[in-house]
Amino acid sequence: MSTFVVLDQPLSWRQVAAIAEGAPFVLSEAAQLRIRAARRLVESIVDKGIRAYGVNTGVGALCDVVVEPSQLRHLSRNIVMSHAVGVGPLLGRCEVRAIIAAAVNNFAHGLSGVRLDLVERLVSLLAHDWIPDVPAQGSVGYLTHMAHVALVLVGEGCVQRGVERRASADLLRALDLQPLVLEAKEGLSVVNGTPCVTGLTALACLRAERLLNWADVISAMSFENLHGQLSAFDAEGLALRASPNLSEVGERLRSLLEGSAILAASAGRRTQDSLSLRAIPHVHGAARDVFAQTAAVVDLELRAATDNPVVTGTEDSPRALSQANAVGAAIGLSADALGVAMAEVAAMAERRIDRLVNPLVSGLPAFLASDSGAGSGFMIAQYTAASLVAENRRLAAPASLDGGITSGLQEDHLCHATPAALKLLKILDNAEFILSIELLAAAQAYDLQASPLARAPNTDIVYRAVRNRIPHYRDERPLAKDIERARLIIREPTAVDFENEGASESGPPESDWHAQPDAAPEAKAPRSRPPRRRSKSSAPGKTANPS
C-alpha cells in the first residue's frame, strides 16, 4: 500500500497519483478549518442577498437569471442532474480516484464554499474504495465527470468496488447515511474547476514516468541485440547538447550496456547506426523534458483554486469573484504536449522492433522465428506495433485546438482539457503495448544470437526476469497472451530500478519480479542517476525497491 497522505497543503501530482493507486488520505485540521470558513462566506453572501454566479443565479448563458432564496437547494441539485450527461465506457478505478483526490484538493484551498460534510463524503468514498460510475465521454473541458461523482452524494447513480456493484442509494442506507441535500453553490462547485483534467494528468504523469524508465532499458536491449556502436552515447558528444535529460539518458544507456561482450565484439563494425538506435538519448531525453514540464504544470494546477466563482473576504464583507479560473488551458496544452512526446518514444520503439525482425539488418533469423518459414515468429507482432503507432499519430493531434461554442455564445472558447488528458492516457496504453512487444522481441533476439557472447550484466537481469515469466516463443501459443504478460511487467513500478542493486543489508529490501503487478508502492521520480551493475551476490530476476 502506498504512503498515507495527509491533505494539509496542496497535494503534489505524485500524491494524487498515489491516492489514485490506493493510498489512504485524510484532511488535516487546517484544511477542515479553511473549508468551514469558506462555507460561512457563502452563507453570508446568501443572507446579504449579494448577487453571485451559481450561488443565486443560473449558470452558463443563464448567469443573469436571479434565483430566489427558496430555490437555491433546487438550483444546486438541478445543476448536478443536468450536468450528469456523460456517455460511453466507464473510467477505471484509478482514473476516478485521481479525479476525486484532485477535487478534494481544490475544496481544501478554502475558496469554494462547500460544506465539510460534502468533502468528507468524497474522502470516505475513497477510503472504502467505492468508485462512482463515471462515463468517459461528454466533456469539452470539465463539468460532466464530476457531476457523475456528485450523483453518488445525493443518492443517485451506482458505485463499484472490485466485482461488487451497488446503487448509490443502497450504499448510503448500508452506511446509515441520508442522501446529501446540496446547499447554495454546492451544485456548481462540485462540478466546476479542473479536478478532472488535473487528476487524470497526474495519473498520466506517473504512468509516463515509469514508461520512460522502461523505454531506456528496453531500447538498450534492442541496441545490444543489433550490435550498436556505443560511441553514439559518448558523454563528451552528448554534453554538446545543453539538455540534462539527454545526458542522463546517455549515462543510463552506458551503464545498462557496461560489460557487454556482444557490443565489445562489434565495436567499430559500422561508422554509425540508424537513428532509431543512435538517437535514443536525444528522443528519450526530449520526452523527459516534456514530462518534467507537464508534471510542473500539474503541480501548479493543484496549487491553484480553480472554482468559479471563488469566495473571499470576511463574513461581514464577503466577495464572490467570477473569473475564468476553471478554464484548463495550461494543463490541457501540457497534456497534449506529453501525448506527442510519448507517441514519439513509442514510434521509435516500433522502428527498433522492425529492425529486430528484419533479417536484412538484424543478422538474426527472419522475424525472430525459431523455425522461419514454418513459423512466422514476430512478423505480425510488428504489424500490431505499427498499427498502434498509427493510432497514436491520430491521437497526438492537439485537443486544445478543437474549439467550439456552447451555452448560447456564453462559452465561446473551449480548451478541451479533459479530452486532452483522456487521449494522453490512451496514447500511454498504446505505448505500453508497443514497448511490451519490443521487450519480447529483444528477449527472443537474445535467444537467437549466432554467437554465445555474454550480455551486459544489467540487460541480463531484465532478460532473465522476462524469461522467468514468459518462455521463448516457438509459434506454439497465441503471442497476444505474451504481450499482455510483458505489459504487466512494464506496469510494475519497481521493475526497472537497478540503482540499489547490491545494497547493504541495511538498505532497501529487494522486490520480487513475481510480485503482483497491481501492488503500488509510493510513486518515485525519474532516476537522477543511471542504473549500476548488479553485484555478484544478488539473485538474478530481482530488483531493488525505489529509493
Language-model regions: role of each:
Residues M1-G49, S76-V134, E236-A239:
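Glycine-rich, flexible loop motifs
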Residues V104-A108, S124-P132, V140, G155-C158, ...:
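Alpha-helix capping at helix-to-loop junctions
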